[in-house]
Regions:
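Alpha-helical transmembrane segments and their immediate juxtamembrane interface regions
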Residues: 2-5, 115-147
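Membrane-helix interface/capping segments
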Residues: 58-82
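Loop-to-transmembrane boundary segments
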Residues: 83-96
């Protein structure tokens, strides 16, 4: 099987598309009177946990693959798990970039209303979630390299 690394510009395109979509939804929400900005606090927690799990899986695959077969412990990494870890890391690159753009895009039009308590909380939620998504994207690149 021949697997190629995800080019950096795929993540850049996903980030820009997410940025445009997030900003568009925030502007649409402001003009229509219904808001779709912000995110619950459990979202960055769940995304962070997924990132840590993916990193641990990628490290396990790398340790198994990089060790001399004669010196390997009696452990075995299932090829399906190794492949799924690689796919998870590739998905985290694109999803992390798109979601970081989405939440970052929501911040741009609403930053002018930050004096309101709702908008202040929404901007904070979006900023934290965007940072976690960027970290997930980085973990995806590292995990892909490790696999």
């Amino acid at each position: 099987m021949n697997v190629r690394r995800t080019p950096w510009w795929h993540a850049a395109i996903a980030l820009v598309l997410g940025l445009g979509a997030g900003a568009g939804v925030a502007v649409l929400g402001e003009s229509s009177g219904t808001t779709l900005i912000g995110t619950p606090w459990f979202v960055p927690v769940v995304l962070g946990v997924i990132g840590v799990i993916a990193l641990v899986l990628a490290i396990n695959v790398h340790q198994y693959a990089a060790t001399d077969p004669k010196k390997r412990p009696k452990t075995f990494v299932n090829p399906s798990v190794a492949f799924n870890t690689l796919v998870l890391c590739k998905a985290m690159i694109l999803a992390g970039a798109a979601l970081a753009g989405w939440y970052g895009g929501q911040i741009i039009p609403t930053i002018t209303h930050i004096e309101g308590s709702f908008y202040e909380q929404a901007v904070l939620q979006c900023a934290v979630t965007a940072a976690v998504c960027l970290a997930d994207m980085g973990i995806g690149f590292v995990g892909e390299w490790l696999c």
